[in-house]
């Protein structure tokens, strides 16, 4: 590769003095830690890790037994056509059957639980490791629905779930993607499977509020089993004046049900796209326009997977690390990645997006707008798209000679390569000295460019051994003035 000779690009007298971590790195670092769990209290309550929250959801010890020892809980279910014999003695008012819409949405809710754990659901009058039933009631007891935990004792009513429908409450008549009726179905099926509320409260028993929560993450941003708004944990699922809800288990629910019955790694084990151009075959994972409302925690069994949020026009923050949250499509903290899940790629939209990769080789595309992109570890492909984009590197190990990142569309005078948070600059204040070739001094940098191939590179010797400890390659030419330290 030939080296550009212009002094504005490579000169023995060109040097950059460290100015400390930049505002771009500050935004990356702040968002990367915004949803950290454990440790210090949040909202005056203990902050629970995913495992702690999962254990608390399972604290009542209720579970179905694997009767045939095949490693899977197989449940049959029916939609009741008449009230059970003790229905009226329980003060439930008038019985009614599920409508076709309710049946279809209940099946989708069950499917979302089967996706994440070793549980199957079959419509049949009986059979399997246990039986579930669905029905409507009319007498309000303060709750919109209720279900029974699977305790193995006489009169436990395990498997039953009931949904309120009367002249004053119609939400359960129209369940659908992202609405409260669908969330209610998913919540009650969670009880039937063995999950409790994240706190010791129940609808109809006093007037519980978030103040009664045991731990900070007891909100609908983390669990469909919670009663409390996601706003309590700094999230916001409101868009275009409407409140939206998860249609499937969220991060803590997924961890809990997998502790109980095991994880379903067969689910989406190939290359899966979530968001626009989705092939996940689930309504809650699919976006079709910038007005789409996504609220989900992704469970994925393997493959090379992509968050495609390219059709959104709003400013977005996308984090590919497991147990992280992202701000997608104008909402806040509405998309998360379940524990144990790896998503390799992320595509931003036309807003000013912030993208954070993980330790693997990611493909990160900012799209239009002035984007900030941090690949993290691994040999990443970074696309800024149109606009003035900043490519941030926080450690020497983020892009090495053995696994260099490649910036696929660098535009000099517009884009930036931000090295300001690398400790040699941020802490040790090592000047960055541009040279034509390494001479054995720490802090030397070589900018190279081949006009014929339009490929360039930035190599830095941090140890003074005349070898590149840090290497990032570019499609397009970078100048000294494009580097930030």
From Swiss-Prot:
Q: Which GO terms describe its biological process?
A: collagen catabolic process; extracellular matrix organization; zymogen activation
Residue sites binding Ca(2+) 3 per the record: 349, 351, 353, 366, 368, 371
| Pfam families found in the cross-reference section | HemolysinCabind (PF00353), Peptidase_M10_C (PF08548), Reprolysin_4 (PF13583)
Q: Where does Ca(2+) 4 bind?
A: 358, 360, 362, 375, 377, 380
EC class name: hydrolase
GO CC, sorted alphabetically, is:
extracellular space
What CDD domains does the annotation carry? ZnMc_serralysin_like (cd04277)
User: Which residues are Ca(2+) 6-binding?
Assistant: 376, 378, 380, 398, 405
Q: Where does Ca(2+) 7 bind?
A: 385, 387, 389, 415
What does it do?
Secreted protease which is important for P.entomophila to counteract the local immune response of Drosophila. Can degrade antimicrobial peptides (AMPs), e.g. Diptericin and Cecropin A. Thus, protects P.entomophila from the Drosophila antimicrobial peptides produced by the gut innate immune response, and promotes bacterial persistence in the Drosophila gut and killing of the host. Is responsible for maturation of pro-Monalysin to the active toxin Monalysin, by cleaving its N-terminus.
Q: What does the similarity note say? A: Belongs to the peptidase M10B family.
What is the name of the protein in this document?
Metalloprotease AprA
What organism is this sequence from? Pseudomonas entomophila (strain L48)
Instruction: State the encoding gene.
Output: aprA
């Amino acid at each position: 590769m030939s080296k550009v000779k212009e002094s504005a690009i490579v000169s023995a007298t060109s040097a950059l003095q460290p100015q400390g971590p930049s505002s771009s790195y500050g935004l990356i670092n702040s968002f990367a830690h915004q949803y950290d769990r454990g440790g210090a209290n949040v909202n005056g309550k203990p902050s629970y890790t995913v495992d702690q929250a999962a254990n608390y959801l399972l604290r009542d010890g209720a579970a179905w037994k694997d009767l045939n020892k095949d490693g899977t809980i197989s449940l049959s279910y029916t939609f009741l056509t008449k009230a059970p014999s003790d229905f009226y003695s329980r003060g439930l008012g008038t019985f009614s059957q599920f409508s076709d819409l309710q049946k279809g949405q209940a099946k989708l809710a069950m499917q979302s639980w089967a996706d994440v754990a070793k549980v199957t659901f079959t419509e049949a009058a009986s059979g399997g490791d246990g039986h579930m039933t669905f029905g409507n009631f009319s007498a309000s007891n303060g709750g919109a629905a209720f279900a029974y935990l699977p305790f193995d004792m006489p009169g436990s009513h395990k498997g039953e779930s009931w949904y309120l429908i009367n002249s004053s409450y119609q939400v359960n008549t129209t369940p659908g993607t992202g609405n409260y009726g669908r969330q209610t179905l998913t919540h009650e099926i969670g009880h039937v499977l063995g999950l409790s509320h994240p706190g010791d409260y129940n609808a109809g028993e006093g007037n519980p509020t978030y103040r009664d929560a045991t731990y900070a993450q007891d909100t609908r941003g983390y669990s469909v089993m919670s009663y409390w708004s996601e706003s309590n944990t700094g999230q916001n699922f409101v868009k275009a004046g409407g409140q939206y809800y998860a249609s499937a288990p969220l991060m803590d629910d997924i961890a809990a049900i997998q502790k109980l019955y095991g994880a379903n790694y067969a689910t989406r084990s190939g290359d899966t796209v979530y968001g626009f151009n989705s092939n996940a075959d689930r309504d809650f994972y699919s976006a079709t326009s910038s007005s789409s409302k996504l609220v989900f925690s992704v469970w994925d069994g393997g493959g090379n997977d992509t968050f495609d949020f390219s059709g959104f026009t709003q400013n977005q923050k996308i984090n590919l690390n497991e147990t992280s949250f992202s701000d997608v499509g104008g909402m806040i903290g509405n998309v998360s990645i379940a524990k144990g899940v790896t998503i390799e790629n992320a595509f931003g939209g036309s807003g000013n997006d912030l993208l954070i990769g993980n330790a693997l080789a990611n493909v990160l595309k900012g799209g239009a707008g002035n984007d900030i992109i941090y690949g993290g570890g691994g040999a990443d492909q970074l696309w800024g798209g149109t606009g003035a984009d900043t490519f941030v590197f926080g450690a020497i190990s983020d892009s090495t000679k053995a696994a260099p990142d490649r910036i696929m569309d660098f535009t000099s005078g517009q884009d930036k390569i931000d090295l300001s948070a690398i400790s040699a600059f941020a802490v040790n204040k090592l000047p960055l000295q541009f040279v034509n070739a390494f001479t054995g001094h720490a802090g030397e940098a070589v900018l190279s460019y081949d006009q014929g191939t339009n490929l360039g590179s930035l190599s830095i010797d941090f140890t003074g051994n005349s070898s590149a400890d840090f290497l990032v390659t570019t499609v397009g030419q970078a100048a000294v003035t494009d580097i930030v330290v």
